[in-house]
Each structure stands twice: as structure tokens, then as C-alpha cells.
Amino acid sequence: MNAESTFELHAPMSKGRRKLRLRHFVPVVAFGVLVLTFGWALNRNPREIPSALIGKPVPHFSLAPVKGRALGLSSADLIGNVSLVNVFASWCVACREEHPLLMQLKSAGLVVHGLDYKDNPDDAAKWLDTFGDPYTRTGADRNGRVAIDWGVYGVPETFVITKDGRIAHKHIGPLTAEGLESTILPLMRRLVRQ
């Protein structure tokens, strides 16, 4: 075998052939970018979806009380104290999961308000009577309009509210002891000191 036989001669690539290669290359690259973006999105924590309302005043609203409760909930009620607003429903399985933690927060003296989302009045009242009522005030958002204004994706969701009625934090999904201890309670303590 001589040195000349190891080299092949290639004719310059025609324009048609270059277009054909490019036509196959672009979709492969686009698919790769799509797969990477999808993989990145799947690995994000859905509880950390940023809210456009962070740092802004709570939306203006006024809700009647849940059946059997004396006090409804309005935006005016969220001024003066650092508080939590918990969006819940009697039909929500995850709400039942976090409920004992809300009862503990009430026992610890924290101000926790409830926003009952798209619920049957009798079911909401029965649920609170059965599992306990951790809320200082509870508004019935029967049609879900107020929850939409708050940017609620589903239940449960919990908001930390500053003394001057601004949204400081949004937690999506059921509260956990770990989440309370690592994020929500330290934030509330800091806001109380301000």
C-alpha cells in the first residue's frame, strides 16, 4: 500500500448537497434544544414558580365568611399584622395533608387567614368543623375570582403578607414542616422585626 492510496479525492460539495445536509441538520439541532429545554423545565421545583405579585399590594377584594363563620376576609384585613393567607378547599386532598401544620401555627399565635376556593358552602363548613378551624378570618371565594387575582394555580397555596399588606412570599402546594422551618417562619420573623 503506498502513501497515495490512503488519501481519497473528494469533489467539492455541490450547492444542492449542502442544502440537503443543512435541511437535515437544522431539525436535529432544534430537536436537541427542545429536549434540553424540556429536561430543564422538568427538573425545576414547581413550588418555586415566581409570582409577579411578590412585593406588590394584595389585590383588592372583599369576601363573605364561610358558612357558620362570623368573619369574612378582605384586603383591608391584611394590613397591620404579618400574616399568612392559605388558599384551601374541602375537596382538596393536599389541603388535608397540610391542615395539622396550620392548626399548630394557630396554636403558636400566628395570624393565619383562609381563602376557601370554589367550594360548596356546606362542605367547607363541615370540613372546618371536622378538622378544626385554624383561620382568624375565612373568606368564601365561591367562583374563584379572587384566587385568579392572586395568581393561584391550584390548591393549596399559601402567601406571606407583610404588615403593610404586600405579598412577600408565595408557596405552591401543601405546607411541610421543613418548608415552614426553612423559609416561611424565618421570613415572617424578619418581617415582624421590620
Residue ranges and their predicted role:
Residues 43-45, 64-71, 138-141:
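Short gly/ser/thr-rich secondary-structure transition/capping motifs
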Residues 129-134, 141-192:
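Thiol/disulfide oxidoreductase modules built on the thioredoxin-like
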